[in-house]
């Protein structure tokens, strides 16, 4: 399949937005986490992303608050500000048997390693992958525009990911960001 190398911000803005239409599970308890990990461990391809509460002070960075792991049908929003990185999560993140596809995964992995060290295996970074198809743009928004012909909304990116409860808008944004990586990867490799 042939793709354009680049897309303008105006062209992306004119595209229809893509939204995850599957089930979203907010994971905040150890029991819910165990169930999510059990389900995810059976998958062979998972969409991957993280969210961090933004800092508006120079030199201050916050810890990752949310880990998104998505199948085509269900996205698990794991609240790392409320739960530790357990052995079960690390088993998934370290597995070569389960492909985890995301954008700019190196930064996400570095952030997760600050919470608990692990060896990342099985990760596919769309920012590297798209170059094989002649795509030069590296943002997820533009990659989605080029490959899927749809835009990913970034309206919730700077919201508070450590809030007591995630809003429906935050949940949809976070789920879409992880899930769309599967859609892009599948279209690229079709």
Which role does the model predict for each range below?
Residues 145-190:
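Acidic, Mg2+-coordinating catalytic module of metal-dependent nucleases/exonucleases
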């Amino acid at each position: 399949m042939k793709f354009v190398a680049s897309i303008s911000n105006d062209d992306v803005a004119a595209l229809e937005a893509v939204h995850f239409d599957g089930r979203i599970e907010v994971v905040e308890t150890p029991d819910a986490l165990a169930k999510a990990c059990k389900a995810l461990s059976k998958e062979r391809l998972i969409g991957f992303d993280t969210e961090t509460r933004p800092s508006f002070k120079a030199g201050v960075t916050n810890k990752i608050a949310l880990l998104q792991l998505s199948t085509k049908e269900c996205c698990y929003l794991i609240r790392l500000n409320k739960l530790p990185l357990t052995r079960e999560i690390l088993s998934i993140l370290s597995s070569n048997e389960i492909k985890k596809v995301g954008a700019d995964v190196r930064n996400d992995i570095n952030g997760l390693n600050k919470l608990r060290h692990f060896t990342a295996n099985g990760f596919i970074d769309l920012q590297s992958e798209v170059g094989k198809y002649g795509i030069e743009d590296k943002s997820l928004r533009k990659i989605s525009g080029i490959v899927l012909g749809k835009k990913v909304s970034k309206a919730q990116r700077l919201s508070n990911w450590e809030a007591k409860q995630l809003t429906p808008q935050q949940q949809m944004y976070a789920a879409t960001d992880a899930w769309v990586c599967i859609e892009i990867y599948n279209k690229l490799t079709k």
